[in-house]
């Protein structure tokens, strides 16, 4: 149920060390005006819907099915929210969930930890975030990573930032990686040309030489906080960066920060975990991107909805949705912690959808 795509030996060692461990799930929420560009994302059918995606996802993951949610899960063009996958796992396995607000236009409707960030401006401006905010969020990441690190367990770090694969492409490009054509998106056919055009607009604004400045120019508030959290937590325990393109971008950011400022990091303790729909997406090149960045193993759950009774789940097999809010990482955790099979995962997710339909 778990496949290792890169850095095989390091990935195997990580999995062996964390068998039967109950993790903590940190869900980091942020916002970028890049996500409001028409056609940039399917994580919300319209730009207006996308303003509430992160808030609605967090409410559902923490509270589960409710007849009257404050923020209902936004309608998707096709498919079901990955929040169903994440919620099914954390609910059934009683995994603790902490929600962090790195920079949202509205506060979450659940208990959360305020980080003092801000929503990002569109990366095409070349001034997405104030540099003081970027450095503050990194310091917060270091603090919380140290607080949540567990020697006998691990920390899953997931995110929700609509438009985040575009900011990921931007910071990868800003850090010197030739990532165009390799990233993924929520579209069944990745919108590479649109993403690259936006990134080029942002990069045209100024020359950038420092990783903090790359985030300030082109990033979103989640990225720098997660980088700090992973660096600090790796010193004591395991870290599972739960996501595809976005977490590979964070891994590149960590490497840049460590190279520039010599922050102590234990590379043996960090992996990137996603879904097979991201890792094997033929409209991107996730594995090639992971190899280009190096250092961290790329793993993916082999979760498969081919036999699901719900068309909204079968849509994942056609390339829709793919990943989000730590879904792949949580599915990996279910296999590690309780040895869940594909049947176990699908049943838990379908039960949740059935409950929602009857609510």
Swiss-Prot record:
**Protein name as annotated:** UPF0284 protein MAE_56900
Matches recorded under PANTHER family: PTHR38811, UPF0284 PROTEIN SLL1500 (PTHR38811:SF1)
Q: Where are the membrane-spanning stretches?
A: none
Gene source species? Microcystis aeruginosa (strain NIES-843 / IAM M-2473)
Return the InterPro entries for the record: Nict_dMeBzImd_PRibTrfase, Nict_dMeBzImd_PRibTrfase_arc, Nict_dMeBzImd_PRibTrfase_sf
Mention one GO molecular function.
nicotinate-nucleotide-dimethylbenzimidazole phosphoribosyltransferase activity
Entry similarity comment = Belongs to the UPF0284 family.
**What Pfam families does the database record attribute to this sequence?**
DBI_PRT
Q: Which Gene3D superfamilies match?
A: 3.40.50.10210
């Amino acid at each position: 149920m778990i496949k290792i795509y890169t850095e095989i030996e390091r990935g195997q060692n990580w999995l062996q060390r964390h068998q039967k461990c109950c993790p903590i799930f940190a869900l980091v929420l942020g916002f970028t005006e890049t996500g409001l560009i028409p056609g940039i994302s399917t994580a919300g059918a319209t730009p207006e819907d996308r303003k509430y995606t992160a808030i609605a996802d967090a409410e559902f993951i923490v509270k589960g099915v409710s007849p009257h949610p404050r923020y209902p899960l936004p309608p998707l063009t096709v498919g079901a929210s990955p929040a169903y996958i994440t919620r099914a796992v954390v609910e059934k396995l009683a995994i603790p969930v902490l929600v962090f607000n790195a920079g949202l236009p509205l506060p979450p409707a659940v208990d959360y930890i305020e980080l003092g960030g801000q929503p990002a401006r569109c990366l095409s401006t070349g001034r997405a975030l104030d540099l003081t905010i970027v450095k503050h969020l990194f310091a917060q990441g270091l603090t919380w990573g140290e607080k949540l690190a567990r020697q006998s367990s691990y920390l899953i770090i997931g995110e929700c930032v609509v438009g985040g694969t575009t900011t990921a492409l931007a910071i990868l490009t800003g850090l010197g990686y030739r990532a165009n054509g390799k990233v993924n998106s929520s579209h069944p056919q990745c919108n590479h040309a649109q993403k690259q055009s936006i990134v080029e607009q942002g990069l045209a604004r100024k020359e950038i030489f420092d990783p903090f400045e790359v985030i300030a120019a082109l990033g979103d508030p989640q990225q720098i906080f997660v980088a700090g959290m992973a660096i600090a937590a790796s010193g004591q325990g395991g870290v599972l960066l739960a996501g595809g393109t976005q977490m590979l971008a964070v891994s590149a950011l960590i490497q840049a920060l460590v190279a520039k400022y010599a922050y102590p990091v234990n590379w043996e303790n960090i992996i990137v975990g996603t879904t097979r729909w991201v890792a094997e997406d033929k409209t991107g090149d996730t594995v090639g991107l992971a190899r280009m960045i190096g250092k961290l193993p790329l793993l993916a759950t082999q979760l498969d909805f081919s036999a699901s009774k719900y068309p909204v789940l079968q849509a994942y097999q056609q390339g829709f949705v793919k990943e989000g809010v730590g879904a792949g990482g949580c599915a990996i955790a279910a296999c590690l912690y309780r040895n869940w099979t594909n049947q176990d995962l699908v049943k838990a997710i379908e039960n949740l959808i059935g409950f929602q339909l009857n609510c």
